[in-house]
């Protein structure tokens, strides 16, 4: 099987929240933290988040690729080898340095749940969500495994369409509230 590495760049356009949840939010603390590397403590984008979102968009919005092609690229229930391998995407070096020296921090967005009938905030409805701010850049790679040149071209076309769909959608949680607009480029 032939392997090809593609470089991926993801620019955050609006606050990005890919969370881990919190079973013990502290008073005044973050209810919904972003996922961070356990060693560096820096935010990252799990490969599974990108893979799942791209696959979902292709399955629901693409008219160019059928289920069989999508399953071959992303995997199916029969444990056949996938054509696309998504690595975790880390901060670019510039932003990694900025996070480490404190010039870029995650942002805390406070939200409330409104009672539409009364027009007031619900009791215990205050939430604080951690986000990666706009203009932060992540970099990483996607690996394409191909049987032959035609298979490689098909998977590159499928990935290209999926990225176009995601660039017009959102990544992570709370997209309907404006979170997670990203610009993905692949070389």
Task: Label the predicted regions.
Residues 1-114, 121-187:
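RNA-binding basic/glycine-rich loop and surface signature characteristic of RAMP-family CRISPR effectors
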């Amino acid at each position: 099987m032939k392997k090809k590495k593609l470089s991926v760049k993801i620019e955050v356009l609006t606050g990005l929240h890919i969370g881990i949840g919190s079973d013990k939010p502290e008073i005044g603390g973050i209810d919904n933290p972003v996922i961070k590397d356990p060693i560096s403590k820096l935010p990252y984008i799990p490969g599974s988040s990108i893979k799942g979102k791209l696959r979902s968009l292709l399955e629901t919005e693409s008219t160019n690729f059928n289920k069989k092609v999508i399953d071959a690229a992303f995997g199916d229930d029969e444990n056949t080898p996938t054509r696309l391998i998504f690595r975790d995407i880390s901060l670019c070096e510039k932003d990694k340095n900025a996070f480490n020296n404190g010039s870029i921090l995650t942002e805390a967005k406070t939200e409330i749940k409104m009672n539409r009938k009364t027009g007031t905030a619900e009791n215990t409805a205050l939430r604080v969500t951690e986000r990666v701010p706009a203009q932060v850049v992540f970099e990483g790679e996607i690996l394409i495994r191909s049987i032959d040149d035609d298979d490689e071209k098909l998977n590159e076309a499928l990935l290209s369409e999926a990225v176009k769909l995601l660039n017009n959608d959102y990544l992570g949680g709370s997209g309907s509230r404006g979170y997670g607009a990203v610009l993905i480029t692949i070389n």
